[in-house]
Amino acid sequence: NAAGEKFSITTLKYFVSNIKLKKADGSEYVVPQADSYFMVDGRDEDTRFAKVIVPEGNYTSVSFVLGVDSLQNYSPIEDRKGVLNLTTSSDMYWSWNSGYIFFKLEGTSPAINDSTGINIFRYHIGGFKDAMQNIREVNVNLNSGESAQVREGLRSNIHMLVDIKKVFDGTNSFSIAQYPTIMVNPFSMNISANFFEMFKHDHTENFAKVDGVF
């Protein structure tokens, strides 16, 4: 990272939700909430694809929330389906704090002064209230690669790059040695503010002949 610290990642998980796409004409399509919650797990390649059905059109940008909105955090537990089901996503939920962990990054770094020699860092970022508001809406411009040209019966694959170093080296850069563990802590807002810089459009594959999803 920018502080010159070496690190290795053991766990990377985060929620993506509330997906919206904007067309070249300025109109916007909001993916229905029921179809708009995904969890990415760095160790599971199958979770790296967020497949949603959208109307035909040329889409020039996509936005999404990195996290889980307050509506779902407050919803009855029995109504939480898919990746929000606490049976399957219990490691991404604070039962003692009644809220989802939006972003989890864990690993090791020799920069940490740990007498045990384990040298573990943990960043569990969540919270949606004013005192600790970590819900971030990320906007990604698709024009830098190629816009998504969705047509009936065809699929557009939008490829994004996720730069995890931006967690440490974004607008609010920090040292792992100084902050080896951040959970329910106001400093978490400094980290979540770096989420805006993590995502970059790489390229788009248009006109794949698979059912109109991307």
Regions found by a protein language model. Give the residues of each.
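A short, solvent-exposed, low-complexity linear motif enriched for acidic/polar residues
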Residues: 1-214
